[in-house]
Regions:
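Conserved C-terminal "switch" segment of AAA+ ATPases
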Residues: 1-49, 135-143, 170-179
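Signal for well-folded cores of large energy- and translation-related assemblies
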Residues: 3, 18, 30, 34, ...
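A short, mixed-charge helix-start or loop-turn motif at secondary-structure junctions
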Residues: 14-16, 67, 187
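A general structural motif at alpha-helix termini
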Residues: 14-17, 29, 54, 103, ...
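Conserved catalytic-core segments of large NTP-driven translation/proteostasis enzymes
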Residues: 36, 43-88
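Soluble catalytic regions of large protease machineries
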Residues: 73-77, 84-239
């Protein structure tokens, strides 16, 4: 039995772990959270110990950069805030489990982690479009609020391309679906249908970021202050 604070929210832990395997959850609770408590000279586990232990299982150990250039840190914060704002408004059926600008052992400088609140066995194509918007939002937020594009969005753009291919094989762009099923890599991004929708989504994202600029700025400042935000802390800013 693990000594723990009585205020631990089991429902929140369950809500934040649909992506985690039972082995990951067990390791996070029985080993990693206890290690964190011992390092803090405590004989009991707090909610934050479990939350951070689960994040370690999902995205890697925290490996913060002590002397990161403040401008670069702000860029990362704007990037993750952009993801979070668009996620909040475009994918309201998902829960933002965590937003962080703490570098992880996986190499990522920051992340926004959404999780499904119900089991998904099928979905409307608009959810795929929503995921594309979320993927593109970080890079666009940096441009909108810092005046220029930065590096750091390679993974996001790979995700967007993958989701566009996902749309294609489900008939979003019309024919020739059969050819795409044989080799989805043949989807050409010079295709006018794809380019038109891609540009349209970018324009829509930029409008939303400007419309919610106060929330972007507030979330960015909160990230710079705390570095790592839980679902509750994100919603304190976004409502």
């Amino acid at each position: 039995k693990i000594n723990h604070d009585e205020s631990i929210d089991v429902d929140a832990i369950v809500a934040d772990t649909p992506r985690a395997t039972p082995a990951q959850v067990m390791s996070a609770i029985t080993k990693d959270s206890v290690r964190r408590a011992l390092f803090a000279n405590r004989e009991y586990v707090l909610q934050e110990d479990i939350d951070q232990a689960i994040q370690e299982q999902l995205v890697g150990m925290a490996n913060p950069i002590e002397d990161m250039d403040p401008v670069l840190l702000r860029q990362v914060a704007y990037h993750e805030s952009g993801h979070a704002i668009i996620q909040h408004y475009v994918m309201p059926d998902q829960r933002i489990s965590r937003v962080s600008i703490v570098r992880r052992s996986s190499g990522t400088l920051g992340y926004m982690l959404p999780v499904d609140t119900v089991e998904m066995y099928g979905q409307p194509l608009r959810r795929i479009v929503g995921r594309i918007m979320v993927a593109l939002a970080g890079h666009l937020a940096v441009k909108v609020f810092m005046g220029e594009f930065w590096t750091g969005a390679t993974g996001d753009y790979n995700m967007a391309r993958m989701e566009f291919r996902n749309l294609a094989v489900h008939g979003f762009f019309g024919p020739p679906v059969s050819e795409l099923y044989r080799d989805v890599k043949e989807l050409q991004f010079s295709d006018e249908r794809v380019e038109r929708i891609w540009v349209s989504l970018e324009e829509q994202i930029e409008r939303m970021l400007v419309e919610h600029a106060d929330e972007v700025e507030a979330l960015t400042e909160r990230l710079l202050e705390r570095r790592d935000l839980s679902n509750k802390e994100v919603l304190e800013v976004l409502g």
